[in-house]
């Protein structure tokens, strides 16, 4: 395999290459994806199972044209925590089902109305910073997960973090041949070894993981429904819809295709929400397309849905193989943080590419103001509370950008703008 060769979305991959490429994607999403069930105090096996099923459904519904891995959604954490505290986890599952169903209805509406409106509500001057914020607002998360800030900083965590990051960075630039397609996987392995040598990972933890029961059945649960619990979770639909559009835009920019048109936003949005609905029915957490895996594609230039599908199959297998799932859970924060540090930055850069590729003219006040306000809104920490749902970061910035874009569009229609 030639260095830096692009492996396209529909391209077949040899079995001997498919496995390590798929493992790389699974590891990239693992740290963030299992964090959600840990917060909800539930076994992550069911989440690994549904992540795999959801990803395969996504590939099937989008006709294999949109490479995306579905992991656990963070957007539901705040309202779901409230519901779990007051009603129990099964009622949160009911909320997940309803949000997923409403998202499927929204996808049908988009199918009937088209996507031309996106260029009006999110012109390039707004779209670029919104996409960039998907990665930039997670920068702090990468640092905290990597244990390089706060009270968790030790010599071992810093060394492990730096080894992981350094291998990922220099490997992406220097590796040739097949190794140029798996720098993230190699970085994770090197970081793990560094973690063992520095004491970040205790050898007893590894031994305990290897002695876990070989066959482990995920804990399936059924949802219960309460109108009050549903109303607390339902507003998250606004958040995940914006998040989904942003992810499709940045993925399209990475692979060089317009995914909003082919396979279409209606298909990808339906697939995303259908997976969330199924997750609620079997006891898992909601799913969403993952920025970490977009970052992996941006670095490796491997876009094949067969690789993504392989990662999904591996995730399903891991959910039933106790020692394998337990070993993956021993990957420490500094390793996940070191990888995320680079991946989130790559997503941010993809947003800036939108501005460059669309030749956004910043001599026009409208474009300058749009980009400026969106960036500041997303990075300032401003929060808008709507009942039990809080809008902040990229989501709030996207909404502000949409409103401003519509206002500026009206100014143009009535010839009120001073931009020539």
Residue ranges and their predicted role:
Residues 86-202, 312, 317-419:
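Membrane-embedded alpha-helical modules
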Residues 5-16, 38-59, 65, 235-305:
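Membrane-embedded helical hairpins/re-entrant loop segments and their flanking transmembrane helices
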Residues 54-66, 104-118, 168-176, 245-256, ...:
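C-terminal ends of transmembrane helices
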Residues 21-54, 66-91:
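Transmembrane helix-boundary motif of multi-pass solute transporters/channels
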Residues 2, 31-33, 164-171, 182, ...:
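Juxtamembrane interface elements at the cytosolic ends of transmembrane helices
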Residues 1-20, 203-219, 253-260, 268, ...:
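Intrinsically disordered, low-complexity non-transmembrane regions of multi-pass membrane transporters
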Residues 79-88, 172, 293-308, 314-318:
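Interfacial segments of multi-pass membrane proteins
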Residues 16-29, 154-165, 182-183, 198, ...:
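Hydrophobic, membrane-embedded alpha-helices of multi-pass small-molecule transporters
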């Amino acid at each position: 395999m030639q260095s830096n060769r692009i492996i396209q979305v529909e391209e077949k991959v040899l079995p001997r290459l498919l496995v390590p490429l798929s493992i790389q994607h699974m590891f990239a999403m693992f740290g963030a994806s299992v964090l959600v069930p840990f917060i909800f105090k539930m076994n992550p096996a069911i989440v690994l199972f549904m992540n795999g099923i959801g990803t395969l459904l996504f590939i099937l519904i989008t006709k294999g044209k949109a490479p995306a891995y579905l992991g656990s959604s963070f957007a539901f954490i705040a309202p779901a925590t409230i519901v779990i505290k007051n009603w129990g986890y099964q009622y949160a599952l009911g909320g997940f089902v309803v949000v997923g169903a409403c998202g499927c209805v929204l996808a049908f509406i988009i199918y009937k109305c088209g996507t031309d409106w996106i260029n009006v509500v999110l012109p390039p001057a707004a779209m670029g910073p919104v996409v960039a914020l998907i990665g930039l607002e997670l920068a702090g998360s990468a640092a905290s997960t990597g244990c390089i800030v706060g009270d968790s900083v030790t010599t071992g965590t810093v060394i492990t973090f730096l080894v992981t990051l350094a291998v990922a960075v220099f490997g992406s630039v220097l590796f040739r041949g097949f190794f140029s397609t798996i720098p993230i996987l190699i970085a994770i392995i090197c970081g793990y070894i560094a973690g063992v040598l520095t004491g970040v990972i205790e050898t007893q933890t590894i031994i305990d993981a290897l002695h876990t029961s070989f066959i482990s059945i995920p804990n399936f649960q059924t949802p219960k429904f309460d109108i009050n619990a549903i109303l607390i979770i339902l507003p998250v639909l606004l958040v995940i819809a914006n998040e989904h559009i942003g992810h499709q835009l940045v993925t399209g920019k990475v692979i060089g295709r317009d995914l909003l048109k082919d396979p279409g936003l209606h298909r990808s949005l339906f697939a995303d929400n259908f997976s969330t609905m199924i997750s609620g029915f079997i006891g898992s957490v909601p799913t969403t397309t993952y920025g970490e895996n977009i970052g992996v594609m941006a670095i490796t230039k491997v876009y094949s849905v067969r690789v993504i599908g392989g990662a999904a199959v591996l995730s399903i297998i891991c959910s039933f193989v106790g020692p394998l799932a337990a070993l993956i859970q021993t990957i420490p924060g500094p390793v996940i943080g070191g990888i995320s540090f680079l991946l989130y930055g790559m997503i941010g850069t993809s947003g800036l590419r939108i501005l460059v590729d669309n030749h956004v003219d910043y001599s026009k006040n409208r474009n300058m103001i749009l980009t400026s306000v969106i960036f500041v809104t997303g990075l300032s920490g401003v929060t808008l509370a709507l009942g039990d749902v809080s809008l902040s970061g990229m989501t709030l910035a996207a909404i502000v950008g949409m409103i401003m874009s519509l206002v500026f569009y009206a100014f143009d229609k009535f010839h009120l703008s001073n931009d020539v």
